[in-house]
C-alpha cells in the first residue's frame, strides 16, 4: 500500500503541474486508494453491505468502468437520453451495477478534488514553517474552551448554516480553486445523475442516509461551502479588530442604517469602516461543528443583532440566495440552554455566601458565580437508539434481528463498543443517570438479541449463563473511568458521580450522537 501511495504521489504531482485533474479519473490506482480509505473508515457496527463495499476491491469492475468512461460521447449523450431512467447514468440496466459504478466514481473523484487543497495546505505550511499540529483543531478542544470562556460571556447566537438551494453554487465555489474545466463539467454530470439531490440536501434525515453512500465527495463539497461562509465572518472580524474608536461612527451608523438593506454594496464601499466599528468586539468567540455554529459575545443585545444583520446580508450578497435569518437565535446566556455537539449546555448561577471576619466585626458577603452545565439529552439519545432498532420510541429495549447471524462474541463486542463510545463521549455530562439508562437499554437489548439467536427467552438464557454474564462486559468502561479519575483526584470518592470527565481519546463522534 505504501508503494501504491508513493506512485500516486508522483502521478498527482505531474498532473498538478499541468492543472489537469480529469485524466486521473482514468487511472486504476485512484479507485484503489479510494476503496482503501473508505473501507478503513467504516462505522464499527454498520454492515458492510449497506455502504456497498466489500472487503476486496474488484479490479475487473474498475477496468470496465474506465473503458466506459473513455467513451465520452456516450457518456455526455446520456444526459439528454430519454431512456436514462431505464438504463441509468452509466449505461446499466441493473440498478445495483449502476449504483456501484457511480459510487466508485464519486469516491475516486473525491480523492482527485482533494489534491489541489492538500498540496496548497502543505506548501503554505512549508513556506510559513508552522507545524501542522498548530493549524488543526480537534473537536475535543471545544469542550474545555466552552467551559473556560462561555461562563464569562453574556449573549450567544445559535445559528444553523443553511444548505445551498442550487448545486451550481457548489461548482462555482470550486471554480475559485480548481482551474480544470473538464473536472467541473464532470461534477455537473454527477449532480445531474442525482437530480433529486436538492431535496436530499435540505433534509437532515436524508443527509444521514445519503452521506453513507457518497460520504467523502459530498462532505468535501459541504466543507468547501462552509469554508466560504466562515471566510466572510473571519474577514469582518479581522477588519473590525484593526479599527480605532471613532466618535463620528454613531452618526454614520444612524444615518445609513435603513439604507443598508437596499444599498448594501454601496454602503460597504463608502462606509465600510463605520460599519465595522460597530461590530468591534474583543470578546467575541466563534465555534462550529458541521452545519451548526455558536457566536458568543460579552457585548450587548444590539451588538449581536448587528452581527446577525451584517452576516446574513454579506452571505446573501456573496452566494446569491436567501440565508434564512430565522435560523439565527440570539439568547441571553444565563436564561438560555442550547444544543451543541450532543449536549444541552447552559450557564448556571451559583449563589455563595462568604463570611468575612475583621477584628471583632464579621460580614456576610453574597457572591454569584457562573458555571457551564452540560447535560446529555436523554430524549434524543433514546430516539437515536430507536432509529437504530435497539429500543422502542419510549425506551423499551428490543432485540436486534439483523445481528442474529453473527457469533456471540461479535454481538457482545458490537454492543459493548457502542456503549463504550456513548459513555466516553457523554462522560462530561453533569447528570450520570442518563448514562445508566443507556446502559440498561443496550444491556437488555444485547440479552434479547442473544436469546433470540438461541431461540430462547431472556430469563431462561440468563439463568443458564448466570446473571453476571453481561456485567463483566459493561462494567469494563465504568472501571476504566473510575481508575482514571481516582488517579487524578483520589480524595473525592464521594463525589465521583457528580464530576465531569472529558474523555479525549475519541477518534470520531459516534453516528448515534452525530445525527441525533
Swiss-Prot record:
<protein>
    <recommendedName>
        <fullName>Maturase K</fullName>
    </recommendedName>
</protein>
<comment type="function">
    <text>Usually encoded in the trnK tRNA gene intron. Probably assists in splicing its own and other chloroplast group II introns.</text>
</comment>
<keyword id="KW-0150">Chloroplast</keyword>
<comment type="similarity">
    <text>Belongs to the intron maturase 2 family. MatK subfamily.</text>
</comment>
<dbReference type="GO" id="GO:0008380">
    <property type="term" value="P:RNA splicing"/>
</dbReference>
<keyword id="KW-0507">mRNA processing</keyword>
<dbReference type="InterPro" id="IPR024942">
    <property type="entry name" value="Maturase_MatK_N"/>
</dbReference>
<dbReference type="InterPro" id="IPR002866">
    <property type="entry name" value="Maturase_MatK"/>
</dbReference>
<dbReference type="Pfam" id="PF01348">
    <property type="entry name" value="Intron_maturas2"/>
</dbReference>
<keyword id="KW-0934">Plastid</keyword>
<dbReference type="Pfam" id="PF01824">
    <property type="entry name" value="MatK_N"/>
</dbReference>
<dbReference type="GO" id="GO:0003723">
    <property type="term" value="F:RNA binding"/>
</dbReference>
<dbReference type="GO" id="GO:0009507">
    <property type="term" value="C:chloroplast"/>
</dbReference>
<dbReference type="GO" id="GO:0008033">
    <property type="term" value="P:tRNA processing"/>
</dbReference>
<dbReference type="GO" id="GO:0006397">
    <property type="term" value="P:mRNA processing"/>
</dbReference>
<keyword id="KW-0819">tRNA processing</keyword>
<keyword id="KW-0694">RNA-binding</keyword>
<dbReference type="InterPro" id="IPR024937">
    <property type="entry name" value="Domain_X"/>
</dbReference>
Amino acid at each position: 500500500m505504501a508503494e501504491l501511495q508513493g506512485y500516486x504521489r508522483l502521478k498527482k504531482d505531474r498532473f498538478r503541474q499541468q492543472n489537469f485533474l480529469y485524466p486521473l479519473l482514468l487511472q486504476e490506482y485512484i479507485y484503489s486508494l479510494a476503496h482503501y480509505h473508505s473501507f478503513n473508515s467504516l462505522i464499527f457496527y454498520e454492515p458492510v453491505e449497506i455502504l456497498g463495499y466489500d472487503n476486496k476491491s474488484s479490479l475487473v469492475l474498475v477496468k470496465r468502468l474506465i473503458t466506459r468512461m473513455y467513451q465520452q460521447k456516450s457518456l455526455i449523450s446520456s444526459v439528454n437520453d430519454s431512456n436514462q431512467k431505464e438504463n441509468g447514468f452509466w449505461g446499466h440496466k441493473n440498478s445495483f451495477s449502476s449504483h456501484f459504478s457511480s459510487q466508485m466514481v464519486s469516491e475516486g473523484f473525491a480523492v482527485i478534488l482533494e489534491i489541489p487543497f492538500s498540496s496548497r495546505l502543505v506548501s503554505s505550511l512549508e513556506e510559513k514553517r508552522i507545524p501542522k499540529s498548530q493549524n488543526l483543531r480537534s473537536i475535543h478542544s471545544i469542550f474545555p474552551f466552552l467551559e473556560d470562556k462561555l461562563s464569562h460571556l453574556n449573549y450567544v447566537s445559535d445559528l444553523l448554516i443553511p444548505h445551498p438551494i442550487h448545486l451550481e453554487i457548489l461548482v462555482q465555489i470550486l471554480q475559485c480553486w480548481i482551474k480544470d474545466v473538464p473536472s467541473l463539467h464532470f461534477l455537473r454530470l454527477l449532480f445531474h445523475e442525482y437530480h433529486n439531490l436538492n431535496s436530499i440536501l435540505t433534509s437532515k434525515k436524508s443527509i444521514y442516509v445519503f452521506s453513507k453512500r457518497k460520504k467523502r465527495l459530498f462532505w468535501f463539497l459541504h466543507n468547501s461551502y462552509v469554508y466560504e461562509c466562515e471566510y466572510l465572518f473571519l474577514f469582518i472580524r479581522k477588519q473590525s479588530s484593526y479599527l480605532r474608536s471613532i466618535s463620528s461612527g454613531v452618526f454614520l451608523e444612524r444615518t445609513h442604517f435603513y439604507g443598508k438593506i437596499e444599498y448594501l454594496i454601496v454602503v460597504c464601499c463608502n462606509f465600510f469602516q463605520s460599519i465595522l466599528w460597530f461590530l468591534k468586539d474583543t470578546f467575541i468567540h466563534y465555534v462550529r461543528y458541521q452545519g451548526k455554529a455558536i457566536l458568543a459575545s460579552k457585548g450587548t443585545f444590539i451588538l449581536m443583532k448587528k452581527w446577525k444583520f451584517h452576516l446574513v446580508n454579506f452571505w446573501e450578497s456573496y452566494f446569491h440566495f436567501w440565508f434564512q435569518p430565522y435560523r439565527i437565535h440570539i439568547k441571553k446566556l444565563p436564561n438560555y440552554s442550547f444544543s451543541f455537539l450532543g449536549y444541552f449546555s447552559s450557564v448556571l448561577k451559583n449563589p455563595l455566601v462568604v463570611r468575612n471576619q475583621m477584628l471583632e466585626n464579621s460580614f456576610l458577603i453574597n457572591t454569584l458565580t457562573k458555571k457551564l452545565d452540560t447535560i446529555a439529552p436523554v430524549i434524543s439519545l433514546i430516539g437515536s437508539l430507536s432509529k437504530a432498532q435497539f429500543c422502542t420510541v419510549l425506551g423499551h429495549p428490543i432485540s436486534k434481528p439483523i445481528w442474529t447471524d453473527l457469533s456471540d462474541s461479535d454481538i457482545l463486542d458490537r454492543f459493548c463498543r457502542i456503549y463504550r463510545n456513548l459513555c466516553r463521549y457523554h462522560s462530561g455530562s453533569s447528570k450520570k443517570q442518563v448514562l445508566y439508562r443507556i446502559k440498561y437499554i443496550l444491556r437488555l437489548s444485547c440479552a434479547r438479541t442473544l436469546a433470540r439467536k438461541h431461540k430462547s427467552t431472556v430469563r431462561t438464557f440468563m439463568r443458564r449463563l448466570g446473571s453476571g454474564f453481561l456485567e463483566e462486559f459493561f462494567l469494563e468502561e465504568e472501571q476504566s473511568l473510575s481508575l482514571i479519575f481516582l488517579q487524578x483526584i483520589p480524595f473525592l470518592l464521594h463525589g465521583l458521580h457528580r464530576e465531569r470527565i472529558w474523555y479525549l481519546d475519541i477518534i470520531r463522534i459516534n453516528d448515534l450522537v452525530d445525527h441525533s
